[in-house]
Amino acid sequence: MNKIRKIRYILCCLLAVGIMGCSDDDNNSIVTGYEGILYNLAASVNATSQELWSTSPLVLDAKRTDAMEKLQDYADKCKADYFSVFLSGYDQTSLNMAKSDSILYFYRTAFERVLDGVKSSTVENGTAQIWLLYNMGYIIKTPSGCFGIDISHRWAEEFAPYLDFLCVTHKHSDHYSNNLIQAMYDLDKPVLSNYLQPVASYPFYSKKSEEYTIGNFKIRTCITNHNEASLKNFVTVFYIDCGDDAGGLTLIHTGDSNFKPVQYADITDANDVNHHVNVLIPRYAPNALTENDIIGTGTGQVTPDYVLLSHVLELSHADEEDSRWTVQSAWERASKINCQQTYVPMWGEKLVWKNGKLN
C-alpha cells in the first residue's frame, strides 16, 4: 500500500469512527467513537486544571502534588518532535492537535486563562500580578503597566495589545516568539534584548549592561554566559523595579544564565539593589545546583525573598538529558535552593504581590 492509499485509508477509518460515534436517546446523549475520545480527554484535563488551579504554588500539599503529577503523565506522552509540529502548524491544525493531546489541551487552556486574566483583571494599587504562561515566560501586571519576559508560546502574539514592553533574555526559541516580537514592533512597543535590532540605533538593543525607564518601571540588565559553555555573553539578565504603585515589587529573571556571580555585579551591587530582590526567577540549572551561586550577600549575589524555579516541562526538549525537567525533579531541586521560600509554579497560575509578600 503506497503512502497516498495509506493516508486515504486512515482518513476513511477516522470518518467511519466519527459517523458511528454519535448516538442519543430522549433523555441522554452518549458521545462515543472519536468524538467520545475527545470529549473524555477534555473532561479529564479540565478536571486536572481545576484541581491544580484550586491550589496555591506556595503550598505543596497532596492535592497539588496529585494534579501536577497528572500533568507530568500527560507531558511524558508528548514527544518533542510532535510538539515542534504543533508549534509550526497552521492555526487550525494546532488547535486540532491541542484537542487530541492532553498536555497540549492544558497548554491551550492555561494560555486562555492567562490571556483572560491579563485582559480583564484590575490590579489593586500597591499590588502586582505575576502570571506564569509557559516555561520561563512570565507576565507581570501592575496598576500602571504590564510587561512580559521570555514569552514563548504558539499563540503568544495575542498578548501584544496588552503588554507595554517585552524582555527577551536570549536567542533560543523556547524563550521568545517571533510573532509576538513582530506584533510588538507593529504596535511601536519596546522589545528589550541583546540581539534584536529592527532599526539602526534601536534604543532597547544592547550587548552590555544597561539601565532603562519605561513608565513606572526601572530596569537594569547585565550580560552573562549561557549554561552551555560555548555561548559566552549570550544571556541578558533583567532586574525590574515595578514601582511604588506595584508595592515596590522587584524581580530578577535570569533566563538560561550560568549563574556566574562576577557577571551579575552590575545589577546586584548597584546601590538601589544592594544585594536584595523580592522575587528571583532562575532556570533549573542543569549543572549541579549552580542557582545557589548567585544567592547570598557577596559580590554578584542577591538575597531573594522568594524564588520561583522555572524551565520545567519544556516540551520542545526531549528528556531530562536535554533539560526537560520533570515536576518531581523540580520539587527536589527547589528543596535545595538557598531560599526557604522557593516554589515551582505551573502554567496558567497567578501570584499576587501584596503587603510585601506573595499570595
Question: Whereabouts are the PLM-identified features?
Answer:
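Metallo-beta-lactamase
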Residues: 23-132, 139-158, 165, 176-181, 192-248, 336, 344-350, ...
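Active-site environment of divalent metal-dependent phosphoester hydrolases
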Residues: 155-157, 172-176, 198-200, 212, ...
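C-terminal motif of bacterial Sec signal peptides marking the signal peptidase cleavage site
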Residues: 18-21
